[in-house]
Each structure stands twice: as C-alpha cells, then as structure tokens.
C-alpha cells in the first residue's frame, strides 16, 4: 500500500480537523494538527507576553510540540504540559491569525511539518498545506462552508465544552478571520491549482469523509 500524503485546506471552522482526524483513524494515517501548532505559538506569545518571533521559537524549541493519543482523542503537548483545551479558547483563537502570519514563525513550523511528513502515510489540515507545506501531496482538498454554518458549528462546539459564546459575535469574528487569512502577506489562505473544491454547507461529516476517502483509496 502506498504511503500517501493528504492535504486539507480551508477557512476557519469548515470542518477540516474533524474530517482529517476521522480519515486518519479509518485509513491508518498519522494526523498532524498544523492549526494546533500555530495555536501553541499563539499561546506562548500570550503567556510570555511577547510578539518577538525568535523568543516564541526558542520557547518551543526548549519545550517541543508533540501529539499523543488520549482517552478523548488526540492531545497536544508543549514539553510535558497538556495544552489541548487551552489552545482552543477564544483568546487564542482571536490572536492566532496575527501570530501565524509572522514569517519566522511560519518558516519554523513549515520545516517541522515537512520533516514529520517526509515518511508519508500522513494527513494534514490548515490554511496553506497544499500550496506551501506539502505542494507534492497526492491528494489536496479545499474545504469550504458558509460563514453562518461555520459559526453554528463553532457555537455548538463551544457550548458542549461549557464555553459561553455569542453566535452573532462569532459570525463577525469568523468573517474577519477569513479576511485576515486571505489577505495576509505570508502564505495566505488560497486554493491550490490541483486541489478539489469541496463545499460542506449542508453536508454531514460522514458525507464529507466518504467523499475524501473514496478519492484517497484510489491513490493508495
């Protein structure tokens, strides 16, 4: 069986991570949560009260990012600290575009991601996987959905975690995040020329997973 690389890109809350995790489990692939890596960098920036990219990188080099399978799914570690939940707070979410747009941060993270992906048998999701991180990926998907639907998804997700959230404010924040991600100077959110455009509006997770898995199995 061929060890393929699958890249899933798309805007915030389009379902990338959920879909990628399920496909990884179903097809026996490694799931590399690139978004979580940038959220870690943002968390470090907030906790250390710095926007100095070199200091953020140095902290992460001293406390490496790793992923582990926990009882409730994949866990994100920074050194020995479990940051799975804290990197998903609104404070981190609203600051991640700014930190992830820093050239030095992106170059550091991309190098780390490419190193891990070299062996193949991997699925990654993010904003620039198909265009920058894994331009040679065997299968590229660009997953989109309406702002309203994405806000509803994030709203329900936050409620299930006990995080109080205002739906209308979420819609504004997601639309603004789209604008920032699409217009930033470094690696903007962009569909790769050879990526398959998949609109998930009105579709179930099961339908999206099935579509991508059918494409992937033909390449394995």
Swiss-Prot record:
Binding annotation for ATP: 10-18
Molecular function via GO: ATP binding; CMP kinase activity; dCMP kinase activity
InterPro entries: Cytidylate_kin, Cytidylate_kinase_dom, P-loop_NTPase
GO BP, one annotated term: pyrimidine nucleotide metabolic process
Subcellular location: Cytoplasm
GO terms under cellular component: cytosol
Family per similarity comment: Belongs to the cytidylate kinase family. Type 1 subfamily.
Predominant cellular place of this UniProt entry's protein: cytoplasm
Species whose genome carries this gene: Lactococcus lactis subsp. cremoris (strain MG1363)
Protein name according to UniProt: Cytidylate kinase
């Amino acid at each position: 069986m061929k060890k393929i690389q699958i890249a899933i890109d798309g805007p915030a809350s389009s379902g990338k991570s959920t879909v990628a995790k399920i496909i990884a489990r179903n097809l026996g692939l490694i799931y590399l949560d690139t978004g979580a890596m940038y959220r870690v960098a943002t968390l470090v920036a907030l906790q250390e009260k710095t926007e100095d990219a070199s200091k953020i990188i140095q902290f992460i080099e001293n406390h490496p990012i790793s992923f582990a399978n926990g009882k409730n799914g994949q866990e994100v570690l920074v050194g020995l600290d479990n940051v799975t939940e804290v990197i998903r707070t609104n404070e981190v979410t609203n600051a991640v575009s700014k930190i992830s747009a820093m050239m030095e941060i992106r170059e550091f993270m991309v190098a780390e991601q490419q190193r891990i992906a070299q062996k193949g048998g991997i699925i990654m999701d993010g904003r620039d996987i198909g265009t920058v991180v894994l331009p040679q990926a065997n299968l590229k998907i660009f997953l989109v959905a309406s702002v309203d639907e994405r806000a509803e998804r994030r709203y329900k997700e936050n409620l299930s975690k006990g995080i109080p959230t205002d739906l209308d404010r979420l819609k504004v924040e997601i639309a603004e995040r789209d604008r920032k991600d699409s217009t930033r100077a470094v690696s903007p959110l962009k569909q790769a020329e050879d990526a398959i455009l998949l609109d998930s509006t009105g579709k179930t997770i099961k339908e999206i997973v099935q579509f991508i898995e059918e494409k992937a199995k033909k390449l394995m």
